[in-house]
Amino acid sequence: YTVEQFADLQILRYKVPEFETLTLKQKELVYYLTQAALEGRDILFDQNGKYNLRIRRMLEAVYTHYQGDKSTSDFKNMEVYLKRVWFSNGIHHHYGMEKFVPDFSQDFLKKAVLGMDAQLLPLAEGQTAEQLCDELFPVMFDPAIMSKRVNQADGEDLVLTSACNYYDGVTQQEAESFYGAMKDPKDETPVSYGLNSRLVKEDGKIQEKVWKVGGLYTQAIEKIVYWLKKAESVAENDAQKAVIGKLIQFYETGSLKDFDEYAILWVKDLDSRIDFVNGFTESYGDPLGVKASWESLVNFKDLEATHRTEIISSNAQWFEDHSPVDKSFKKEKVKGVSAKVITAAILAGDLYPATAIGINLPNANWIRAHHGSKSVTIGNITDAYNKAAHGNGFNEEFVYNDEERQRIDQYGDLTGELHTDLHECLGHGSGKLLPGVDPDALKAYGSTIEEARADLFGLYYVADPKLVELKLVPDAEAYKAEYYTFLMNGLMTQLVRIEPGNNIEEAHMRNRQLIARWVFEKGAPDKVVEMVKKDGKTYVVVNDYEKVRELFGDCLLYTSPSPRDISGSR
């Protein structure tokens, strides 16, 4: 499963089992949707930073056409840098958000660029190779320029200090005021304002540049639409055909009302074996959590494994009723939480190559409340992770003792998958906003708190006797494997992705740290969880698993979707 390793990355392969069981028409549909997915790659690069595409193309030209000695450390280090750019869809780390530091000299790159045929370089009109270097080198080599893709540091202007390309010439205050003025507190079905546009200031006037056919990114979007039209012609049924048709309409109009109509049609299509996401979806890449990055996933249902998630979703009301949060924050009637295990046929955009293993959509609160949501666990990706991790020495190195290791070996894969199922299927779908509460009230903290809420819901229930009763886990000990690995990862091992001295910026990583630290600190008087030194190494030790579950429940109370307390979240 492992292809290669460089920097802090390991590249894995994944299998696409059961593809051959699809009908010829279904395979054709997967092919067209896959082509549509491939066309959006450059959108994401540009969203992540305005110079990313030109830096990538300049480096690709050198990588492909360099005539000098390729065995030098300069060339080899440039190759690693380029691979990191490919992996992170830009010049910033996909988790840490900090800019990559090139381990090759400016002189080397400049000589290489100036020695190239100018037609191979991404030159602007009338630009020389020398001017290209003058424009792009400071962005690459000066640590003070565009140092962070998404900055979440409290008290700073998050828009001006973030290198992502969602705003141009606009301050955080201006952006928040612009979208604040659009919102009507009485509107119970609001569109996701600002989701599919760049906010710019031109001639002193703030305006949106919409991503659509004829707007920004039209070259890529026209190609996406071309393949979607082909997919529409081989749809499995009328419902799916309507979904694809409405998505095409959204790409052509850029209207967020069309986007909501598409999302409602999509969430109601439960009969198709093949499903897909294609478009501006998640807002983690915007420090204000407003604008969505482009992503795509084409998949088909894993019929056998879906049985597990169907048991969970059919008991969704029981889980909602028995959660430890206040009754006023619970849904009286849980609407259509559909859950399935899927096989990914392709990952693209912001889902590639570092991908989610579980997804719950749509994101609009009112659509979830009125029409339900779709929750998926990506089975073949989880399987690749599990297969690559077995026997790599990680647990032998970091897990405190043999008893914990044996438990993780025995139950870890199963409880990990169950936690993902519970996180997506019930966690994101649980709870409700009280009337009049702005879903964006938590601003920059919204993404992290929402992820924490979903994780805590899953953690709280993975230890519930109900799971033994439903035959989802073999016994009452299994949950301890997930608790141990979650706490070890949150407190310690996930930090391998962060450079010393830097802060954790990515929402999912922040949430894991938040939960693990909460349990560690709140449980400290009773030594519920400890960090213990043994032979000069630090280990996580869990002394009281039942108390850990209680603390997860307490933390869940603080992250429930109402009343949206920003100082508490901070």
What are these regions (language model features)?
Residues 15, 459-554:
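Long, well-structured alpha-helical subdomains associated
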Residues 23, 447-463:
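An active-site-proximal "capping" alpha-helix that borders the catalytic cofactor pocket
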Residues 431-451:
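Post-HEXXH active-site segment of zinc metalloproteases
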Residues 80-204, 208-406, 412:
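Contiguous, non-catalytic segments that form substrate-binding/exosite surfaces or channel walls
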Residues 419-432:
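Active-site recognition of the HExxH zinc-binding catalytic motif
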Residues 558-569:
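Single conserved hydrophobic/aromatic residue that forms the stacking wall/gate
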Residues 1-52, 57:
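N-terminal-proximal low-complexity accessory segments that begin disordered
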Residues 238-244, 259-262, 437-439, 467-483:
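Short, glycine/acidic-rich hinge or "gate" loops at secondary-structure transitions
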